[in-house]
Regions:
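Conserved, mostly hydrophobic/aromatic
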Residues: 5-6, 36, 44, 59, ...
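H/E-rich (His + Asp/Glu) clusters that bind or coordinate divalent metals
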Residues: 161-211
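Short, acidic/polar
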Residues: 25-36, 78-88, 108-111, 158-159, ...
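An N-terminally biased module of ancient metal coordination in phosphate/nucleic-acid-related enzymes
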Residues: 1-58
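Hydrophobic faces of well-ordered beta-strands that scaffold small-molecule active sites
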Residues: 3-7, 43-47, 70-74, 94-98, ...
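Active-site gating/metal-coordination segments in enzymes
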Residues: 53-133, 169-180
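Active-site environment of divalent metal-dependent phosphoester hydrolases
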Residues: 10-12, 51-54, 79-82, 103, ...
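Histidine/lysine/aspartate-rich catalytic loop segments that bind and position anionic ligands
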Residues: 144-146, 150-169
Length: 211
């Protein structure tokens, strides 16, 4: 099964929040499916962007349209209730996103408590959109968490050694958004695979927004 580990749906029927003046163009479920049809994609993960904040409406609508082969990666405030977690889990959400690069999510000081709570309650992993140059200072904290992934190969060559150490310890790494990184992608993929053959998850990053 070809699974797209990272994509975005932008549905203007639901709230969008300008990020430093940026608002993405519409990219609905039909646009996404048409884009990936040549690739044979059969499932995927719809990831909330900074411009979607804590809105769940667009994500629930997208998952309902896409069907059970697709899951959601959402942003939630620390005040989220157990009932809300249960409801989102039943709808197909499977992960929590901390967007430390662009904002729109809960902040770093809530990472451990919220990530642990979501994992213990509904089995979710937590995903970090972060410049890998900032990983060293939170490396020990990340290794205390049960299930973590890092977006876009960590973005920066300077922090790649930390990404490799984390991969060795079981942290997953999303191989997507190659236009965002400042290093040779092929070499990084080889190094991450050598560190942990199960670490890499490949995604289209469609429609390649400033998410």
């Amino acid at each position: 099964m070809i699974f797209d580990a990272h994509c975005h749906i932008i549905d203007p029927r639901f709230p969008l929040i300008a990020n430093n003046g940026y608002l993405p163009d519409s990219f609905g479920v039909s646009d996404y499916l048409a884009s990936v049809k040549p690739l044979g994609v059969q499932g995927g993960a719809v990831v909330s962007g900074s411009f979607q904040g804590f809105d769940q409406g667009y994500l629930l609508a997208a998952l309902n349209s896409l069907g059970p082969a697709f899951v959601g990666v959402t942003q939630l405030p620390a005040s989220v209730t157990d009932t809300e977690l249960d409801t989102l889990n039943a709808a197909g959400v499977r992960a929590l996103r901390f967007n430390l690069k662009r904002g729109g999510s809960e902040q770093l000081d809530q990472l451990e408590a919220l990530a642990l709570r979501a994992h213990e309650r509904v089995g979710w992993h937590s995903e970090l959109y972060i410049d890998s140059r900032e990983l060293a200072e939170i490396e020990a904290r990340l290794l205390r968490l049960p299930a973590i992934s890092i977006d876009h190969l960590g973005l920066s060559a300077e922090g790649l050694p930390v990404v490799l150490r984390l991969a060795e310890r079981g942290v997953r790494v999303k191989a997507c958004g190659f236009g965002r990184v400042d290093f040779p992608v092929r070499d990084a993929l080889r190094d991450i695979h050598a560190a942990n053959t199960c670490a890499l998850m490949f995604g289209t990053d469609l429609p390649s927004t400033r998410a």
